[in-house]
């Protein structure tokens, strides 16, 4: 049957690799409120504090839904393919060691097997994954049959919502991307430079 995969990027963190900031906690609370009508069957999150805290705030709205932690929902660098990315991204990827890129590629491919497939159950599932920008970009780009590197530049706001549906009879369907209707403008695009964000939305 159909797996409805709800992807939420963690809230704003301070410092970047630290726990949620006050803004991040507010973003997570609003995301939880937004998701209340969804009949979630599971919640999964990565191991880092900013993701675990975001998931905990959201999960408070779903006391009967099981919550698990999985390194496949963690922060890592997906593959870029044998040909590599376009030139503007080469310098960015140089920030990561060869070992980080190899391990990230392994995790990203495993994540496709874990999350990007039809539900094995007889009925539909509604699964929330609280994760990071790179994994969301990877899952979106692969759902749209993009080249391996195309997760680069597919940016997700903190606590924004992306939904992908997987079934056994259709290609993956991107139902929504980077949906921030639950966030006021002041809470959107936190952490991004003005050069890569649209004004006032």
Predicted regions and their residues:
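Active-site signature of alpha/beta-hydrolase-fold catalytic machinery across serine-
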Residues: 57, 138, 142
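Generic beta-sheet signal
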Residues: 5, 123-134
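Acidic, low-complexity terminal tails and accessory targeting/binding regions
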Residues: 2, 64, 75-87, 123-125, ...
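Short, active-site-adjacent cap segments at secondary-structure transitions
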Residues: 14, 50-52, 76-77, 135-137
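Glycine-rich phosphate-binding loop signature in dinucleotide/nucleotide-binding domains
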Residues: 37-39, 118-125
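Active-site metal-binding loops of divalent metal-dependent hydrolases
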Residues: 11, 133, 180
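Active-site-proximal alpha-helix that buttresses catalytic centers in soluble enzyme cores
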Residues: 2-70, 99-104
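Phosphate-handling substructures
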Residues: 15-16, 59-117, 201
């Amino acid at each position: 049957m159909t797996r409805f995969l709800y992807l939420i990027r963690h809230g704003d963190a301070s410092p970047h690799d630290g726990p949620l900031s006050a803004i991040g906690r507010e973003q997570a609370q609003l995301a939880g409120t937004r998701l209340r009508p969804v009949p979630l069957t599971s919640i999964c999150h990565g191991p880092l504090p900013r993701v675990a805290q975001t998931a905990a705030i959201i999960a408070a709205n779903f006391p009967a839904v099981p919550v698990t932690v999985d390194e496949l929902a963690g922060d890592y660098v997906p593959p870029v393919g044998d040909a590599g990315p376009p030139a503007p991204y080469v310098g960015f990827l140089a920030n990561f060691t060869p070992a980080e890129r190899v391990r990230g590629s392994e995790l990203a491919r495993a994540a496709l097997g874990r999350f990007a497939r039809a539900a094995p159950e007889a009925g539909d599932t509604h699964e929330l994954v609280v994760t990071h920008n790179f994994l969301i970009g990877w899952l979106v780009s692969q759902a749209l049959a993009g080249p391996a590197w195309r997760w680069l530049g597919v940016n997700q706001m903190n606590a924004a919502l992306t939904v992908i549906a997987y079934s056994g009879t259709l290609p993956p369907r991107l139902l929504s991307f980077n949906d921030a209707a639950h966030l006021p403008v002041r809470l959107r695009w936190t952490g991004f430079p003005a050069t890569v964000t649209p004004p006032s939305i």
